[in-house]
From Swiss-Prot:
Contains 7 disulfide bonds. This is Phospholipase A2 crotoxin basic chain 3. The lineage of its organism: Eukaryota, Metazoa, Chordata, Craniata, Vertebrata. It catalyses: a 1,2-diacyl-sn-glycero-3-phosphocholine + H2O = a 1-acyl-sn-glycero-3-phosphocholine + a fatty acid + H(+). Its main location: secreted. Its EC number is 3.1.1.4. Keywords: Calcium, Disulfide bond, Hydrolase, Lipid degradation, Lipid metabolism, Metal-binding, Neurotoxin, Presynaptic neurotoxin, Secreted, Toxin.
């Protein structure tokens, strides 16, 4: 879900989160 994704993104280093979120 979006909320869960946001949490994962915050946990990541951002650089890895940017592409993950874009996908």
């Amino acid at each position: 879900h979006l909320l869960q994704f946001n949490k994962m993104i915050k946990f990541e280093t951002g650089k890895n989160a940017i592409p993950f979120y874009a996908f």
